[in-house]
């Protein structure tokens, strides 16, 4: 990428995940900072995750301040580099699509295939790191709730179901902070498990409702998964559930220790004896279970408590959609100054 595509200079590695490495980079012409994610296409699962992210982000025709923006995606094979576009007839692109669909490598495995995603650079880490390194702050909580609900409404309006909402996948941008009064900007990221709901039926031009787009692949991160996701039959209402877990945990600073990474993470759960169980899993076993919200007295008022309970309803039909959620959070934030003590 550095030699074949001199548009960017890589500065340093800032993150490494299960299927890619993220670098801080600069655009040579403007010196603007960007994030560049390098994904090696050596396994079908890597290719599928990368294509899902590309399809979701490239399907968005307008930008949203709280959704990560894809500047461009570069496909590299050995020394050959080309810009990737959705629906391209390029043989390299079609080989990746075939690999994703068939679940087996559809190109010469001796060739080095890479995808380079050029996106917004976020300098403040993720939501998990940001909140847990600071004392609880009502103003920050309010700002984050409004930003996240706005992002989710935007994604659902664009027929995108995220399917892996969690604090680790929400990035923090502090570049706009020119005064101490401003809260950082959140950006929903990591669309590797996302699903773009395409139109079907008699009128393919009519936008499909993400709340009527049923999916069957159980995916996500267990502590944020809705009960119907565990069951394998769900819609975009699963994103509402995940956001409910995040907001509840943020307001009350509920955390757990990840057994694999030993990292402290924001996330609410149910206690069963000495064990902690994901809320969605517990509700699948007992849909009538009453969640103890709030855990701490006076941590939220009745309207906030009721909204979180609805977001975490065992029956997805009892949850608000993303547009109602955004409206109700705005009302709580601005019409009821005593939502949190």
Curated annotation (Swiss-Prot):
InterPro entries linked: CC_SR_Kinase, Kinase-like_dom_sf, Prot_kinase_dom, Protein_kinase_ATP_BS, Ser/Thr_kinase_AS
Enzyme class: transferase
The reaction(s) this protein catalyses: L-seryl-[protein] + ATP = O-phospho-L-seryl-[protein] + ADP + H(+); L-threonyl-[protein] + ATP = O-phospho-L-threonyl-[protein] + ADP + H(+)
Main localisation: nucleus
Subcellular location, record wording: Nucleus
Domain of life of the native organism: Eukaryota
SUPFAM superfamilies: Protein kinase-like (PK-like)
PROSITE patterns on file: PROTEIN_KINASE_ATP, PROTEIN_KINASE_DOM, PROTEIN_KINASE_ST
Annotated EC: 2.7.11.1
Gene Ontology cellular component list: cytoplasm; nucleoplasm; nucleus
Keyword line: ATP-binding, Kinase, Nucleotide-binding, Nucleus, Serine/threonine-protein kinase, Transferase
Positions bound to ATP: 14-22, 37
A biological process from GO: negative regulation of G2/M transition of mitotic cell cycle
Listed Pfam families: Pkinase (PF00069)
Catalytic residues as annotated in Swiss-Prot or TrEMBL: 164
Expression across tissues: Expressed in liver, kidney, pancreas, spleen, thymus and prostate.
Residues in Protein kinase domain copies: 8-334
GO molecular function, one term: protein serine/threonine kinase activity
Family per similarity comment: Belongs to the protein kinase superfamily. Ser/Thr protein kinase family.
PANTHER family according to UniProt: EUKARYOTIC TRANSLATION INITIATION FACTOR 2-ALPHA KINASE EIF2-ALPHA KINASE -RELATED, SERINE_THREONINE-PROTEIN KINASE PDIK1L
Protein name: Serine/threonine-protein kinase PDIK1L
Gene, per the UniProt record: PDIK1L
């Amino acid at each position: 990428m550095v030699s074949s595509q001199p548009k960017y200079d890589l500065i340093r590695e800032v993150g490494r995940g299960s299927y890619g490495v993220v670098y801080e980079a600069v655009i040579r012409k403007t010196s603007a900072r960007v994030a560049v994610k390098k994904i090696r296409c050596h396994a079908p699962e890597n290719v599928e995750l990368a294509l899902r992210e590309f399809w979701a982000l490239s399907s968005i025709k307008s930008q949203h301040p709280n959704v990560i923006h894809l500047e461009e995606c570069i496909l590299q094979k050995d020394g050959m580099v080309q810009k990737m576009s959705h629906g391209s007839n390029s043989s390299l692109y079609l080989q990746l699509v075939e690999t994703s669909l068939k679940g087996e490598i559809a190109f010469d495995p001796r060739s080095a295939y890479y995808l380079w995603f050029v996106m917004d650079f976020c300098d403040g880490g993720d939501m998990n790191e940001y909140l847990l390194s600071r004392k609880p702050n009502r103003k920050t909580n309010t700002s984050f709730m409004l930003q996240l609900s706005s992002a989710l409404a935007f994604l659902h309006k664009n027929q995108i179901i995220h399917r892996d909402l969690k604090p680790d996948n929400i990035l923090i941008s502090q570049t706009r902070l020119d005064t101490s009064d401003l809260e950082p900007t959140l950006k929903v990221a990591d669309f590797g498990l996302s699903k773009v709901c395409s139109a079907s039926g008699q009128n393919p031009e009519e936008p499909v409702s993400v709340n009527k787009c049923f999916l069957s692949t159980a995916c996500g991160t267990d502590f944020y998964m809705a009960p119907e996701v565990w069951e394998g039959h769900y819609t975009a209402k699963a994103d509402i559930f995940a956001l409910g877990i995040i907001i509840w945990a943020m307001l009350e600073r509920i955390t757990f220790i990840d057994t694999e990474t030993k990292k402290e993470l924001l996330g609410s759960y149910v206690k069963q004896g000495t064990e902690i169980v994901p809320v969605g899993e517990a509700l699948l076993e007992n849909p009538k279970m009453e969640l103890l919200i709030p855990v701490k007295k006076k941590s939220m008022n009745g309207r906030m408590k009721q909204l979180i309970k609805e977001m975490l309803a065992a029956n997805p039909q009892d949850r608000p959609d993303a547009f109602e959620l955004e409206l109700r959070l705005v009302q709580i934030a601005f019409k009821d100054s005593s939502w949190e003590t």
